[in-house]
């Protein structure tokens, strides 16, 4: 008659070795692999915080631009960005130092209006503040000069 050893799974001598290896593997995963994966994901997320990474910055507004979205420099992205939201809900990155982009953003701060009662062109502040964009004093001075020119040309007013 052949003798067979009946092993209970808990009392199996191989189980102890496997459980120690399993515990070592688990400890390795917890202390080495998981922090490394979290660190790599944080670096990947850090690159995505700047919305215009590795994209060509356009110097003019693309056709079909619905609105402009200036984004301030912050801790996660150290540069100022301007996004153009298109009518088809796409986005394009614009160069915030380009003249065409600055002109469109500056128009949000000051307006040149015609006061019908006094028959005079005047520069009016819109009181809009962007954290991402300083108030353009040079643009305001340009509008004042242009208003003076229009007032002289249309109404022969001198200041």
UniProtKB/Swiss-Prot annotation:
<comment type="similarity">
    <text>Belongs to the intercrine alpha (chemokine CxC) family.</text>
</comment>
<dbReference type="GO" id="GO:0006952">
    <property type="term" value="P:defense response"/>
</dbReference>
<dbReference type="InterPro" id="IPR001811">
    <property type="entry name" value="Chemokine_IL8-like_dom"/>
</dbReference>
<dbReference type="InterPro" id="IPR033899">
    <property type="entry name" value="CXC_Chemokine_domain"/>
</dbReference>
<dbReference type="Pfam" id="PF00048">
    <property type="entry name" value="IL8"/>
</dbReference>
<dbReference type="GO" id="GO:0006955">
    <property type="term" value="P:immune response"/>
</dbReference>
<feature type="disulfide bond">
    <location>
        <begin position="50"/>
        <end position="77"/>
    </location>
</feature>
<dbReference type="GO" id="GO:0005576">
    <property type="term" value="C:extracellular region"/>
</dbReference>
<keyword id="KW-1015">Disulfide bond</keyword>
<dbReference type="GO" id="GO:0008009">
    <property type="term" value="F:chemokine activity"/>
</dbReference>
<protein>
    <recommendedName>
        <fullName>Putative viral CXC chemokine 2</fullName>
    </recommendedName>
</protein>
<dbReference type="InterPro" id="IPR036048">
    <property type="entry name" value="Interleukin_8-like_sf"/>
</dbReference>
<feature type="disulfide bond">
    <location>
        <begin position="52"/>
        <end position="93"/>
    </location>
</feature>
